[in-house]
Amino acid sequence: MVALTQIGAEFKIIATAHLKQIDRVLNGLTGSAHSLKEKSPHAITVGFAAVNYSEEWTGMEGTRSFPVKRTSARAQQESDETARRLRQVAGPAFDEFLLLTFRATNQEPFPFAWLNAAGIAADYGAALVRIADSYEKRF
């Protein structure tokens, strides 16, 4: 018996040091989509990427923490460039690609906010409808 994947998804979050990580994240996303298509050519591929627009972030690695601060202008510029590259490079590799933008610090009391909650909810809902439609047509 062979099991085939009908829907496969990959999710990446870029919280800090966006441009240092972008190539690794893009390779991970596109590689996942291509790998899934090789194994299950008719599979529906879904990509999610989340980009943090916050000026502050504390990264954690084991017991060590790494606080990062960027100016508001730098945070906006770096996040916008990251989002542009994700859409341009990773987006076409997937049947559906959803970019999520947020602000979070990873510092107590752990504030979190979507940049455009209503827009993200609408985009997510529309993607679900398109995925369901693709599923009905393919399977």
Where are these regions (language model features)?
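Generic beta-strand structural signal
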Residues: 5-7, 34, 41-45
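Structural beta-sheet core signal
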Residues: 8, 46-49, 99
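Surface-exposed cleft-lining segments at the edges of enzyme active sites
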Residues: 12-24
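Short, charged, amphipathic alpha-helix that recurs within catalytic cores of restriction-modification
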Residues: 22-39, 85
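C-terminal tail/extension regions appended to the core domain(s) of diverse proteins
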Residues: 55-139
